[in-house]
Curated annotation (Swiss-Prot):
Involved in the post-transcriptional modification of the uridine at the wobble position (U34) of tRNA(Lys), tRNA(Glu) and tRNA(Gln). Catalyzes the conversion of 2-thiouridine (S2U-RNA) to 2-selenouridine (Se2U-RNA). Acts in a two-step process involving geranylation of 2-thiouridine (S2U) to S-geranyl-2-thiouridine (geS2U) and subsequent selenation of the latter derivative to 2-selenouridine (Se2U) in the tRNA chain. It holds the Pfam family Rhodanese. This is tRNA 2-selenouridine synthase. PANTHER family: TRNA 2-SELENOURIDINE SYNTHASE (PTHR30401:SF0). It comes from Sulfurovum sp. (strain NBC37-1). The active site is at residue 97. InterPro entries: P-loop_NTPase, Rhodanese-like_dom, Rhodanese-like_dom_sf, SelU. It is an enzyme of class 2 (transferase). PROSITE patterns: RHODANESE_3 (PS50206). Keywords: Selenium, Transferase. The keyword Signal does not apply. GO terms for biological process: tRNA wobble uridine modification.
């Protein structure tokens, strides 16, 4: 059979959001893959496991023979159909395995035999992943960062989403960055996060942005650690501080952490949604117990319980606004004010959302 096409034009894959078929086993895919990749494995986890044992005991030739025996007949036809169905709806798709070796080559050959030509990634997952990590390091040197700060609930994420030159780290990490910031769906793996961040940086720089705006974060978002080189770059960046009245901040926080959260929990947990949400909120309060101190922790729990009783009695969520107001004034605001005071020399501009949006459009 003639040589089948390969590509190492990873930049084009990123800029075009090229759909990818990952033919690795599910256990490998779960550890980390690329944006726009779908896992349609050549071998499932069990098949990969026994082939791996055969490889260690008897070498490559016997392992390949066993692999072909395991993935044959109806099993083989089903795997090929899964690939051809995906290619039919994504004609620009490419495929890869771990190193661009036998698995992706076999899949590519089987597809060619069925009249479907597809390009495979040269060097596979490993080569593309290494390239993305190198590009992240290069990218950090190519833009001037601006950090968007502001007290909790000031609407930083809302503003960030309006800016074309923003990198939404919390969105990529699927976490709102606070003790109460866990989403109902799990965070991505660190590898998935790093790959998605690399895509975002490469695409933004390709659009010609000189400045990129990031929300003020620490070294991690939830359990996702940010790349050290990025953390260091942002730590010296100029700060733009979003100022929002307290009442508005309470409304924004209530909308995100209570009203919308309830809807999300209902979709997943149905009749048990309130029980699960309540348990999650108690866990979140426990996470800040030490910093709050005994007395304030007792008060915040009592306010929450009062709000919960009101909800159960009157179907009203209004009591949670008192809870949010207490958390803001007694926990989040003092903590943020201390941090912003330490970084006062970095403050470039202060204003409301409209003023900051206008300022950033003109800033050079």
């Amino acid at each position: 059979m003639e040589e089948l096409p390969q590509s190492s034009d990873f930049r084009s894959i990123v800029l075009n959001n090229t759909p990818l078929i990952d033919v690795r086993a599910p256990v490998e895919f779960a550890k980390g893959a690329f944006p726009h990749a779908v896992n349609l494995p050549l071998m499932n986890d069990e098949e990969r496991h026994v082939v791996g044992i055969k490889y260690k005991e008897e070498g490559n030739a016997e392992a390949v023979k066993l692999g072909h025996a395991l993935v044959s007949g109806d099993v083989k036809e089903a795997r090929i159909k899964a690939w051809t169905d995906f290619i039919a709806s994504h004609p620009d798709a490419m495929l890869y395995c771990f190193r661009g070796g036998q698995r992706s080559q076999i899949a590519q050959e089987w597809l060619a035999e069925n009249g479907r030509e597809i390009v495979r990634l040269k060097g596979g997952y490993k080569a593309f992943r290494n390239w993305l990590m190198q590009e992240t390091e290069k990218a950090v040197e190519q833009f001037k960062p601006i950090v968007l700060g502001g007290r909790t609930g000031s609407g930083k994420t809302i503003l960030l989403k309006k800016l074309q030159n923003a990198i939404d780290l919390e969105g990529l990490a699927n976490h709102r960055g606070s003790s109460f910031g866990r989403d109902i769906t799990p965070q991505p793996t660190l590898i998935d996060f790093e790959n998605a961040l690399a895509y975002d940086l490469i695409q933004k720089l390709d659009q010609g942005f000189e400045h990129l705006v990031f929300e003020d974060e620490g070294k991690c978002v939830g359990r996702i650690y940010l790349p050290k080189i990025l953390v260091e770059h942002l730590s010296e960046a100029p700060l733009v501080v979003l100022e929002t009245p307290t009442e508005k901040r309470i409304e924004i926080t209530f909308d995100e952490y209570v009203a919308k959260a309830h809807e999300k929990y209902k979709e997943v947990y149905h009749a048990d949604y309130l029980k699960v949400w309540t348990e999650d909120m108690h866990e979140a309060m426990k996470r800040i117990q030490k910093r709050l101190g005994g007395q304030r922790y007792k008060i915040v729990c009592e306010i929450f319980e009062d709000a919960l009783k009101e909800q159960k009695k009157n179907s009203s969520l209004e009591g949670y606004k008192v809870w949010i107001a207490y958390l803001l004034s007694e926990y989040y605001d003092p903590m943020y004010d201390y941090q912003i005071e330490r970084n006062a020399s970095r403050i470039l501009f202060r204003g409301n959302a409209q003023e900051i949006e206008a300022f950033l459009k003109e800033y050079r």
